[in-house]
C-alpha cells in the first residue's frame, strides 16, 4: 500500500530528551525520578512515563501535538488529572500502604534546604540554638514565633560564651551548696544530739538499793549508752513510771528492787519496736541482751535519724541557694535568677504579649513563692529547737512530789521540780516535833493572818508573819468569814514569789504529811488568781481550814530554821543523774 500518512509518526526519543547533553539542573533526590531509569519508549505515556517528570523548558517540540499527553499550559506542571489516581511512582520501592509524608526529615536528608519547591517547610536543626541577638529580637517580634523553642534565659546571647558562663555559675552554685549542706548538717546533728532522750532509765523502787542500781547503771554506761537514774516513791506505781519513761522516748528501762539486789539480777524492759519485758534476768545476761538490742536500735533508728538530718540539711541548702540567686550577684546581672520557663513568660509579659490563664497563674505562683522565701530569709536560717522536757526532771518531779490522787503525766511540770529551800534530812524529826508542839499548843498566832494584808504584796512572808505576831498579841478562837480571801491571797502570793529562801512551797521538805497533802494538792491545781475559786466546794473549804490552822505556824517555823540552812538544796524529787 502506498498510502502515506498525513503526518509522520514521531521518532524514538533520546534518553536525555532533545538536548545535546543531560540536564545539569536535575538532582539526585529520591523524590524525583532519575533520568537513567526513564523508559526510552515514550509513546506509552500513561504507564511508562514518570509521574514526577517535569518538562524541561528547553523542549522545542510542537506543543500542539495531540499525542503529547502532557499539559502544554505550564512547563512546570507535575502531573495531569489522570495521574492523580496514584501520586507515587510505580518504581518507588516503598510499600504501597506507607502513606507517610515524603517531606518527613527522614526522606528529606538529601534535599537542599534552599529548594524553592517547598519554601514554607522548615527543618528543625540544631543550629537554631546558636542564633544571634539580632535574629532573636527579630524573631521575637514575629507573630508566629514559637516562644518555647529556644531556652533563652536573658543572661546573654545563647552562644558558646553564654554556655561557659552558665557552666561556671552552676559549678559555683554546686560548691556553695556543698558548703551549706555540711554546715547545716553539723548544726542539725548537734541539735538532735542535745534533744535526744536518754538511752536507758534505771528505775529504783527502794532507796536502799541505790548502790546496786548505780553499779548496774555504770555497766550500762560502759555499753556507750546515756543512763538516767530514777527513784520511785510509794505514791506512784511502777507501771505509771514505765509508761512515763516510754512516752519520754527512752528505748530501754531497767527496774531494780530489793529482790534483784539479793539475787544480783534485774528486769529489762525494751520500749522500742515490740515492747518486751524480761524479768529477773541475771546481770550478765541482761547486759548482753541490752547490748544486742541497742545495736539493733542504733541501726534502725539512727539511720532514719541520719536520713532525716540529711533531708533537712539539703532542703535548707537549696533554700539558701535560691535566696542567693534571687538576690542576684554582681556577675549574674539584674535579670538573672529566674528559671528559663518563667523568664520567657516574664519577657512576654514585659513585651505586652498574649499569655494564657495558665501561664499567668505560673507567674503569680512564682512571685508568691519568691515573696515567701524573702520573708523567710528575714527570720533565722535554722528553725527553733524543739521544746522537749528533760526526761529526768519531768519524771522526777512527777514521781516524787505528785500526790496519789493525781495520775502520772509526762508533760506535767510541778512547782517542786524547781530547787526550793529544804531542810537537811537529819532535821526532819526535829521539824516534825516542832510542828506537832505548835499544833498542840493551840492557834497562838492565828490572828496574824487576818491582820497582815501586806502578805499578798511583794514582801517576804517571814517579816510579815513576825511583825504581825509581835504587834498583835491578842488571840482569836477561830477565823471569821472574811478570812478565806486573805488566806487564799497568802497562798497565791506564796506561789507568785517562787523559790525564795524562806517562802513555803508546795510539797514542803518533800514530806508526805497527811495534813499538808490536801493543801499542796489544791495549790498545785489552783491558778495564781483567786477570783475563779469556788468557795462552796467542800474540798476547797477543807483546804482553807488547813491553811488557816497551819499557815502562820509553818511560816514562823520557817523563819526560825532559815538561818540553819546553809544553802538551798534540791528536793528529793530532783533525782536526774546522768553518768
UniProtKB/Swiss-Prot annotation:
- Purpose: Nuclear receptor coregulator that can have both coactivator and corepressor functions. Interacts with nuclear receptors for steroids (ESR1 and ESR2) independently of the steroid binding domain (AF-2) of the ESR receptors, and with the orphan nuclear receptor NR1D2. Involved in the coactivation of nuclear steroid receptors (ER) as well as the corepression of MYC in response to 17-beta-estradiol (E2).
The UniProt gene name for this protein comes to: Ncoa5
Q: Modified residue N-acetylmethionine is at which positions?
A: 1
> Origin, by domain of life?
Eukaryota
Q: What is this protein identified as?
A: Nuclear receptor coactivator 5
Protein's UniProt keywords contain Repressor: yes
What's an example Gene Ontology biological process for this entry?
A: insulin receptor signaling pathway
Where are stretches of biased composition, namely Basic and acidic residues? Answer: 11-77
Q: Which GO terms describe its molecular function?
A: chromatin binding
What species is this protein from?
Mus musculus (Mouse)
Where can the motif LXXLL motif be found? 345-349
NAD as UniProt keyword: no
Predominant location category: nucleus
Q: Which SUPFAM superfamilies match?
A: Class II aaRS ABD-related (SSF52954)
InterPro entries, from UniProt? Anticodon-bd_dom_sf, Nuc_rcpt_coact/corep
**Domain free text:** Contains one Leu-Xaa-Xaa-Leu-Leu (LxxLL) motif that is essential for the association with nuclear receptors.
Composition-biased stretches, type Polar residues, lie in 461-485
Instruction: Give the UniProt entry's GO cellular component terms.
Output: actin cytoskeleton; nucleoplasm
Region (Transcription activation) spans which residues?
Answer: 458-579
Give the record's subunit note: Binds HTATIP2/TIP30. Interacts with YLPM1. Forms a complex with ILF2, ILF3, YLPM1, KHDRBS1, RBMX and PPP1CA.
Q: What broad taxonomic lineage does this protein's source fall under?
A: Eukaryota, Metazoa, Chordata, Craniata, Vertebrata
Q: Where is this region: Transcription repression?
A: 1-158
Composition-biased stretches (Low complexity)? 395-420, 446-460
Where is it localised? Nucleus
Give the span(s) annotated as Disordered: 1-77, 148-172, 378-428, 446-529
Chain positions with Phosphoserine modification:
9, 21, 29, 34, 96, 116, 126, 143, 151, 378, 381
